[in-house]
UniProtKB/Swiss-Prot annotation:
This is NADH-quinone oxidoreductase subunit D. Belongs to the complex I 49 kDa subunit family. It comes from Deinococcus geothermalis (strain DSM 11300 / CIP 105573 / AG-3a). It comes from the Bacteria. Keywords: Cell membrane, Membrane, NAD, Quinone, Translocase, Transport. It catalyses: a quinone + NADH + 5 H(+)(in) = a quinol + NAD(+) + 4 H(+)(out). It is a peripheral membrane protein.
Length: 403
């Protein structure tokens, strides 16, 4: 009796395979919000990824058209709830350009500080949750330790830890507390030591390096064609940062570097955000040195609310206050767009004015919506486990996606 060794079937006629579709979300820890991904897989390998958005649609763009320009400040920070000051600043800059408003130097400096603190806050959430998605629990607590300290600074200035609504057309809602600059300086001292810890736990972790290096590569030309911005674009070798390319709030007077990588993979996107934490701290330290006493609002009473002290002595101030609160100001007819650099990329508010007290049209250029379009390109051909890494490295915020 002879025996033949058993061999697995290799002929296409004998081996039958089929594509399996898998739902990821809309409630899934890795999406950090309500995002549904339909993933087509051939075995363990991804053949297609289709994002289904809209679960967090708020209708903010349309809401802006039914609110005065002053009331719009309330809605802007809720679009990206991790870098609230990014959208808030982009909105008021567009309205100020439409009006030709003059923002005092002190208000501009405070805006820069809060803008960069907001970037730090967003990147800290990215660092903590990005590693958590890959199974590393410890960095989450380290990053959220500093995140809570940043939110304490926000609360000290404007009373809110999130969705602050602190900026105003023409300046700020109120001045910062006297001890706030000292608190910021003390935070930066501990924060920069914390970044060293993140690099030890995060950038030098061999397991993480194996999961992220060479995974989800987005080449330079593809990143440009897809319209990516922010760290996702700079990780692919394009040194575009609107703080340098289209300066606003005096960023051209600050000394800082724009981190760039040529790798284009998930590891590069993680590493760039770590480097940006240090650059933001550098900018804030410079802003602290140039913070001088002065006004915090445009003196034009047809734009800015008069201080409470004037309301007790001036009938003209009472009239201006009444008109601004009940009706708002009337910008000239025209359209405007000011690009800014948020934690996720280019944020801009395209505003059309018909001369009324409310915008005729507001279009929000949000980076997360555009950046998410790169997900399929980065995932196809890789394993399903890599999808979680790639999605975390793109760092979308769903409020920024759906609007």
């Amino acid at each position: 009796m002879t025996t033949e060794p058993l061999t697995p079937p290799t002929s296409g006629a004998l081996l039958h395979t089929e594509i399996m579709s898998l739902n990821v979300g809309p409630q899934h820890p890795s999406t950090h919000g309500v995002l549904r991904l339909v993933v087509d897989m051939d075995g363990e390998y991804v053949t297609r990824v289709t994002p289904h958005m809209g679960y967090l649609h708020t209708g903010f763009e349309k809401t802006f058209e039914h609110r005065t320009y002053h009331q719009g400040v309330t809605y802007a920070p809720r679009t990206d709830y991790l870098h609230c000051f990014g959208h808030e600043l982009a909105y008021v800059l567009s309205v100020e350009k439409l009006l030709g408003a003059e923002v005092p130097e002190r208000a501009t400096t405070v805006r820069v500080m809060l803008h960069e603190l907001g970037r730090i806050h967003s990147h800290l959430v990215f660092v903590g949750t990005g590693l958590l998605d890959l199974g590393a629990l410890t960095p989450f607590f380290y990053a959220f330790r500093e995140k809570e300290a940043v939110q304490d600074l926000f609360e000290a200035v404007c009373g809110y830890r999130m969705n602050q609504g602190y900026f105003r057309v023409g300046g700020l809602a109120r001045d910062i507390p006297e001890d706030w600059p000292a608190r910021v300086a003390a935070f930066l001292d501990t924060f920069e030591r914390g970044v060293d810890e993140y690099e030890t736990l995060f950038a030098k972790n061999p397991i993480f390096l194996d999961r992220a290096k060479g995974v989800g590569v987005i080449p330079r030309d593809v990143a440009i064609d897809l319209g990516l911005t922010g760290p996702n674009l700079r990780a692919s070798g394009v040194p575009l940062d609107h703080r340098k390319a289209n300066p606003y709030c005096g960023y051209e007077t600050y000394d800082f570097e724009v981190p760039v990588s040529q790798a284009g993979d998930s590891l590069a996107r993680f590493q760039l955000r770590l480097l940006e934490l240090r650059e933001s701290a550098k900018i804030i330290r410079q802003a602290l040195k140039r913070l001088t006493p002065g006004p915090i609002k445009d003196p034009n009473r047809k734009i800015s609310l008069p201080p409470r002290s004037e309301l007790e002595t001036s009938m003209e101030a009472v009239i201006h206050h009444f008109k601004l609160v009940t009706e708002g100001f009337h910008p000239p007819k025209g359209e405007v767009y000011v690009p800014t650099e948020s934690a996720r990329g280019e944020v801009g508010y395209y505003i059309v004015s018909d001369g009324g007290s409310m915008p005729y049209r507001v279009k929000i250029r949000a980076p997360s919506f555009v950046n998410l379009q790169a997900l399929e390109y980065a995932c196809v051909g890789g394993q399903f486990a890599d999808l979680i890494t790639i999605l975390a490295s793109i760092d979308p915020v769903l409020g920024d996606v759906d609007r």
